[in-house]
Amino acid sequence: MSISAQNPDISGDRQSGQDVRTQNVMACQAVSNIVKTSLGPVGLDKMLVDDIGDVTITNDGATILRMLEVEHPAAKVLVELAELQDREVGDGTTSVVIVAAELLKRANDLVRNKIHPTSIISGYRLAMRESCKYIEEKLVTKVEKLGKVPLINCAKTSMSSKLISGDSDFFANLVVEAVLSVKMTNQRGEIKYPIKGINILKAHGQSARDSYLLNGYALNTGRAAQGMPLRVSPAKIACLDFNLQKTKMQLGVQVVVNDPRELEKIRQREADMTKERIEKLLKAGANVILTTKGIDDMALKYFVEAGAIAVRRVRKEDMRHVAKATGATLVTTFADMEGEETFDPAHLGSADEVVEERIADDDVILIKGTKTSSAVSLILRGANDYMLDEMERALHDALCIVKRTLESNTVVAGGGAVESALSVYLEHLATTLGSREQLAIAEFADALLIIPKVLAVNAAKDATELVAKLRAYHHTAQTKADKKHYSSMGLDLVNGTIRNNLEAGVIEPAMSKVKIIQFATEAAITILRIDDMIKLVKDESQGEE
């Protein structure tokens, strides 16, 4: 039964019952259909043009959805879901949206057949818990003391669907080296890989294979003046977040002067205030000064005389990373509690050397040998902006995946292997339950097959046949003890056959799969619980008051 009526107490439209659910499911299907064709190693790219005409060409689910201006509230849930997956895992954003939309579609069919949403939700929750347990107990492969090979394979799998898949060997090595070089142990003795310390710089020219890894944090700006030294070693770095310019009096300040000479004194004092600040900096031992704001010519003169490097207009984000890597404190003002201006030498960070180098046509400041945590930079080369942006997105995903693999130490086979195994397992599980949840779990099992199906369709292969074969292998693996190794059988999309993906090196971190299932189920449940939608209309009478 569906009602769509004006309720006298509500200033707005109200829709409830099946109508709303169908509408929500349709909206989610529409979002999922947009990213569906970009899944997998042979997925296609999307060209997005925003309102000012900027073009983005990408294959990354999170980027596509972020740039779509989605109006529908239920579809927005999926967009946020992709962003969450991007933050938590870094890859698998497309999969998570497709799975969530498929779960919703199937749940909606069940509701139409008079199964109550609450039964479906509890069935989905049970299926999710069982899936995660099954992955962790039966499907994962421990990668003891990870050598480089599994890491490189994980990075290659992540890149396989991106623009740089042709050079995935080359880039996978770059990524793994970059992640391993920022390895650190925190106070609790845990080994962490802060990939925020990996700076990605994009420079036009040459080919993608001319990209390289630089030891040191690269800032995309040059020295503020030519007279400054090209190299400072050892470096004491001050990170500032304010102007080093002549302090002008604020607007509205009135100064009454009787003597014209007083005017000159005021001007002189304005200049001296900046000079004193610079002297305090240099006295504290700073020989590299980075600021997010500007430095005027008068201030530069003092730095040149002192033989220090000053860099202005550094990005705030870069500044935070440099401060973290060198042990510096980002200083926003010199004034202390009493209003006195001081600069504590403890705020300085230290590095072995700071040099200016030329990369492509741009001057770049490199901070090498940082004190607290090591920092590296990936210098990407490429033909144009679109290509460089897409390379950066691909490398971001790969860096996240390698980090997750190192931290969790477990991998699973890719190419639809996990989804098929879970599907077969959950179908069997559903038949052992005598409750209503049985139907929901069977639908959950079917919904997971959407991943191998879409992979096969995108590769222009016969999806029905391939998925049937794949399920047969996994059924054998789960019923016959001597055929356990079949559980890592997945799709080989180049040849359109089934192969053992663990041996073929198509692997992903286990946590990526677990998170996809958890997030997709939670999102589907959130949307499934909605059975009433009230769109409020702005009350005119209040506006007039």
From Swiss-Prot:
Q: What domain of life is recorded for the organism? A: Eukaryota
Mark the residues carrying the PTM N-acetylserine.
S2
Any idea which GO molecular function terms this record carries?
A: ATP binding; ATP hydrolysis activity; ATP-dependent protein folding chaperone; unfolded protein binding
Q: Where in the cell is it found?
A: Cytoplasm
Q: Name one GO cellular component term.
A: cytosol
What Gene3D superfamilies does the record point to? GroEL (3.50.7.10), GroEL-like equatorial domain (1.10.560.10), TCP-1-like chaperonin intermediate domain (3.30.260.10)
Tell me which NCBIfam families the record gives: chap_CCT_alpha, thermosome_alpha, thermosome_beta
What is this protein's name? T-complex protein 1 subunit alpha
